[in-house]
Amino acid sequence: MFIDSVKITLASGDGGKGAVSFRREKHVPLGGPDGGDGGNGGDIIFVCDNNTHTLVNFKGKRELRAQNGAGGMGRNKNGKKGENLELIVPEGTQVIDAQTNEILLDLTKEGQRELFLKGGKGGLGNTHFKHATNQRPDYAQPGIKGESRLVRLELKLIADVGLVGFPNVGKSTLISVVSNAKPEIANYEFTTLTPKLGLVDVDEYNSFVMADIPGIIEGASGGKGLGLAFLKHIERTSFLLFVLDPMRQMPLKEQFIVLRKELEKFSNELFGRKFGIMISKSDSVNLGEEFAEQITLNINELENYLKEINNPQSFLIKVSSLEKTGLKELKFMLLEEIKTLRNNK
């Protein structure tokens, strides 16, 4: 199950209370204080792990707490520190204050560890309060309470390439043939209901991560279709690949314009992201000479429009995932773009 947003209360452990204790030995009837200190409460720590791809482990949990520190004991024995609670999250997880929407942590790198809530300090035992005018203090400190915070965990997938297109244009088929991802593929809209990540091996030494985002429809930036729930996943992709389908009733030019407008409404930064264009289902030209001519005119109209707006795309390529034509060229084109972006960071 893919879960990319949860609300939960997190709490670090309370400090253990200090002990009130006195030495009791056979020949020392009125021994001095020997109360040990309470142990510190456990911390809340976030750990980023790229073997985890969803927040499903947090689903249905209202609160998670680290262990409290143990109380101090006699003979100056200190209480044990409470165990830390380590929360394993995928790359791309943000920890957000649920009340102010402030981003508190942004976990983007494998192995990243972040202390989020410090456990409460253990109280001092009565040993610490002995002084000249009070040789037998009968009090100790309570432990300090741990911290508590209501947060929202939001997952934004991190990928090198994000596929952008209407539903059922061939994105899932593409990622299934170029990567190790195996999405559901069928001839109906919104087959992809959750984002999918796939590792694309270009050659023996080079690879990149591709994200198949559920199809975007006009009005997605306002919440239509699968809307905002998945547009956010494109935000963390370095390069966008628009997948346009010549078999749709909407011309290629119009598909491109609508998709770009939805990205612009959602995020100006996303609108300015580098991108390429892939014409999918290029095998559809086999449906007859007249249909092939229509597709050629459709592509020419798109190319003329791109010239009018000064060719903002990095490339335009025709691909057939079914016949596996253009795939090798596409992978190398994407790799070159990704290498350039990585070098410019």
Swiss-Prot record:
<dbReference type="GO" id="GO:0005737">
    <property type="term" value="C:cytoplasm"/>
</dbReference>
<dbReference type="GO" id="GO:0003924">
    <property type="term" value="F:GTPase activity"/>
</dbReference>
<dbReference type="Pfam" id="PF01926">
    <property type="entry name" value="MMR_HSR1"/>
</dbReference>
<feature type="binding site">
    <location>
        <position position="192"/>
    </location>
    <ligand>
        <name>Mg(2+)</name>
    </ligand>
</feature>
<dbReference type="InterPro" id="IPR014100">
    <property type="entry name" value="GTP-bd_Obg/CgtA"/>
</dbReference>
<dbReference type="InterPro" id="IPR006074">
    <property type="entry name" value="GTP1-OBG_CS"/>
</dbReference>
<feature type="binding site">
    <location>
        <begin position="212"/>
        <end position="215"/>
    </location>
    <ligand>
        <name>GTP</name>
    </ligand>
</feature>
<keyword id="KW-0963">Cytoplasm</keyword>
<feature type="binding site">
    <location>
        <position position="172"/>
    </location>
    <ligand>
        <name>Mg(2+)</name>
    </ligand>
</feature>
<comment type="similarity">
    <text>Belongs to the TRAFAC class OBG-HflX-like GTPase superfamily. OBG GTPase family.</text>
</comment>
<dbReference type="InterPro" id="IPR006169">
    <property type="entry name" value="GTP1_OBG_dom"/>
</dbReference>
<dbReference type="Pfam" id="PF01018">
    <property type="entry name" value="GTP1_OBG"/>
</dbReference>
<dbReference type="InterPro" id="IPR031167">
    <property type="entry name" value="G_OBG"/>
</dbReference>
<protein>
    <recommendedName>
        <fullName>GTPase Obg</fullName>
        <ecNumber>3.6.5.-</ecNumber>
    </recommendedName>
</protein>
<keyword id="KW-0460">Magnesium</keyword>
<keyword id="KW-0378">Hydrolase</keyword>
<feature type="domain" description="Obg">
    <location>
        <begin position="1"/>
        <end position="158"/>
    </location>
</feature>
<dbReference type="GO" id="GO:0000287">
    <property type="term" value="F:magnesium ion binding"/>
</dbReference>
<feature type="domain" description="OBG-type G">
    <location>
        <begin position="159"/>
        <end position="339"/>
    </location>
</feature>
<comment type="function">
    <text>An essential GTPase which binds GTP, GDP and possibly (p)ppGpp with moderate affinity, with high nucleotide exchange rates and a fairly low GTP hydrolysis rate. Plays a role in control of the cell cycle, stress response, ribosome biogenesis and in those bacteria that undergo differentiation, in morphogenesis control.</text>
</comment>
<dbReference type="InterPro" id="IPR006073">
    <property type="entry name" value="GTP-bd"/>
</dbReference>
<feature type="binding site">
    <location>
        <begin position="165"/>
        <end position="172"/>
    </location>
    <ligand>
        <name>GTP</name>
    </ligand>
</feature>
<dbReference type="GO" id="GO:0042254">
    <property type="term" value="P:ribosome biogenesis"/>
</dbReference>
<keyword id="KW-0547">Nucleotide-binding</keyword>
<feature type="binding site">
    <location>
        <begin position="320"/>
        <end position="322"/>
    </location>
    <ligand>
        <name>GTP</name>
    </ligand>
</feature>
<keyword id="KW-0479">Metal-binding</keyword>
<dbReference type="InterPro" id="IPR045086">
    <property type="entry name" value="OBG_GTPase"/>
</dbReference>
<dbReference type="InterPro" id="IPR036726">
    <property type="entry name" value="GTP1_OBG_dom_sf"/>
</dbReference>
<dbReference type="InterPro" id="IPR027417">
    <property type="entry name" value="P-loop_NTPase"/>
</dbReference>
<feature type="binding site">
    <location>
        <begin position="190"/>
        <end position="194"/>
    </location>
    <ligand>
        <name>GTP</name>
    </ligand>
</feature>
<feature type="binding site">
    <location>
        <begin position="280"/>
        <end position="283"/>
    </location>
    <ligand>
        <name>GTP</name>
    </ligand>
</feature>
<dbReference type="GO" id="GO:0005525">
    <property type="term" value="F:GTP binding"/>
</dbReference>
<comment type="subunit">
    <text>Monomer.</text>
</comment>
<keyword id="KW-0342">GTP-binding</keyword>
